[in-house]
Amino acid sequence: MEHTYQYAWIIPFLPLPIPMLLGVGLLLFPTATKNLRRMWSFTSVLLLSIVMTFSVNLSIHQINSSSIYQYVWSWTINNDFSLEFGYLIDPLTSIMSILITTVGIMVLIYSDNYMSHDQGYLRFFAYMSFFNASMLGLVTSSNLIQIYIFWELVGMCSYLLIGFWFTRPIAANACQKAFVTNRVGDFGLLLGILGLYWITGSFEFRDLFEIFNNLIYNYNNGTNFLFVSLCALFLFVGAVAKSAQFPLHVWLPDAMEGPTPISALIHAATMVAAGIFLVARLFPLFIVIPYIMNLISLIGIITILLGATLALAQKDIKKSLAYSTMSQLGYTMLALGMGSYRAALFHLITHAYSKALLFLGSGSIIHSMEAIVGYSPDKSQNMVLMGGLTKHVPITKNTFLLGTLSLCGIPPLACFWSKDEILNDSWLYSPIFAIIACLTAGLTAFYMFRIYLLTFEGYFNVHCKNYSGKKSSLFYSISLWGKEGQKTIKKKIRLLTLLTTNNNENEKASFFSKKVYRLDSNVRKMTRPFITINQFDNKNTFLYPQESDNTMLFPLFALALFTLFVGAIGIPFNQERMDFDILSKWLNPATNLLHKNLNNYGDWYEFVINAIFSVSISYFGIFLASLLYNPVYSSLQNLDLINSVAKKVPKRIFWDKIINKVYNWSYNRGYIDAFYETSLTKGIRGLAELTHFFDGRVIDGITNGVGVTSFFVGESIKYVGGGRISSYLFLYLSSVSILLLISYFFLNQ
């Protein structure tokens, strides 16, 4: 066993040769490297699979032995200061390593087909491998210095992948927005690390926790409690930015401009999980400061509600899932703030697999839609243009439904077990927080089934002729989350003004993207099913989406299995001779470090009573979403009698106002982006303009004024002189005499 832990250092370094070799190969042998691109992708998957096997082996040893291993190499700079580098293998490390490698492998396999048409195929795999290596280095770090180094590398990789299509201005802007927002958190993290070192004199976690706890409990040592709390707050700010928690969450929806596979990896196992990992790693430090714990739980509950409300009106399928990630990680942050360490990690695990499944499923949908509507994200990711995909992409539909039900908290899927545990703990912590968390669970079920119904149920809206973004029907305006038109729209209006009827069958509709994307020779030839409809003299050919290839479907199957069964590791009850709670055994060393004897077990009766309430709320959200978005109710838009009766009801006006307010709040992202734009962006630009004015008119004015004054004085004196030295000498002596007399006069007074 000891021999196994000695080689744990290979975990972060094994995927590292891929980006290095790809960089050298593309620089020196570009043609040969590109011709062997499938070999590079296979090698990436192979190396990450070896790391996964090693991580699973370490986890099995930890479950059986309940031990923590740390290896450190000391680098002495002088007698007073030395840097120590090493790796730490504990339950948190093993959990995160398995999470990163399993999700990473699925994303790499999926990306082989998804990115096959892209010119940056090899660059994408280089970034992805470096991303995985950086995240593995982060979770195996044994001190704060290593944490910060890999923290920055994880951020750098995420910026590169968010702006992967950097020629698109919107992607470049999203990359810059993520960078600037995370700079705030990273600066806070750096200040916190420096402050802790100034207080404790150590970067190592175990030494740091022991010294910090002694300083907190011994008030006579002169340590300023406010300064200690401020350092902990700075550390938490870093986690807030990385995990897209309020108020530094604004970068997350814009990060969807990157390729869909990287969205899955960022939201499941790397970027946003890094912030949760940091709080979990420093949990022994935070838990001794009640004010910080209360702040963590407060930020968590605000993020839970905010993320859920912002997801209600999104039409972009990826942005809807992004806000879902923000809300679900809020549950994890709430659990950490309440002190529920086990529940937080449990929900991090279950959410990661469910969200990876949903993002890869959305990528499969987008991939199939691109052949119909073009490569513009405004079209291929727009749920308004989808609908009726059940019969066209049945496998994607079933796996997406599984992930949706899991995120809604429906038993026996993964997220049910973890979310239910957090909800139960919240009732003991704060009834107000518990009420908000439970209501948000219903909102989660509502917006997740909204995504599912708009995408898969009904009819394929691209070819729908009797479709308009604004209808007089209450049901239809709700289902699209659009504002109701003031006038009744005629049925002959098509989906969008871009969808026009073309009698010339050789002329493509203007809706399709006019921009030509050049595909390389490795693009697989794909045929799309189509239906030809002859109506009198018009002949219309309709294309429909097609199911993705097996290399994209295999990760969906694998993640669906994880979504089904991963919740079994944390079933929170222990009955006669039956111990299902593998997670508690796994976390024993960590809970012992916290000096807590947590009892996570309950009986079946208590568990069922608590679960019935949370599941009922989720089913109510699903029912409400089905009521508003089900195609059966949407078809009622054609019944003018119902619409006329509904308009006469007085409550209809009040109901429409509520809908519009919720829509405006959600569609405008809670006006938070606008507030930042007004207060920060425009404020900084105004300050820059003021500084430019002061520098140009005042500073430069003084400098130039001295020069101009000297010039004119010199010119004036030039005409006074007559060219005789005796005159100059007389003038000089006279001036000196006058100055001496003036000085003498003032001194005597």
Curated annotation (Swiss-Prot):
GO terms for cellular component: chloroplast thylakoid membrane
Subcellular location as annotated: Plastid, Chloroplast thylakoid membrane
UniProtKB keywords: Chloroplast, Membrane, NAD, NADP, Plastid, Plastoquinone, Quinone, Thylakoid, Translocase, Transmembrane, Transmembrane helix, Transport
An example Gene Ontology molecular-function term: NADH dehydrogenase (ubiquinone) activity
EC number: 7.1.1.-
Highest rank taxon of the organism: Eukaryota
Gene3D superfamilies linked: 1.20.5.2700
Main location: plastid
InterPro entries: NADH_UbQ_OxRdtase_chlpt_su5_C, NADHpl_OxRdtase_5_subgr, ND/Mrp_TM, NU5C-like, Proton_antipo_N
Catalytic activity: a plastoquinone + NADH + (n+1) H(+)(in) = a plastoquinol + NAD(+) + n H(+)(out); a plastoquinone + NADPH + (n+1) H(+)(in) = a plastoquinol + NADP(+) + n H(+)(out)
GO biological process terms on file: ATP synthesis coupled electron transport; electron transport coupled proton transport
Family: Belongs to the complex I subunit 5 family.
Listed name of the protein: NAD(P)H-quinone oxidoreductase subunit 5, chloroplastic
Lineage: Eukaryota, Viridiplantae, Streptophyta, Embryophyta, Tracheophyta
Chain's gene name: ndhF
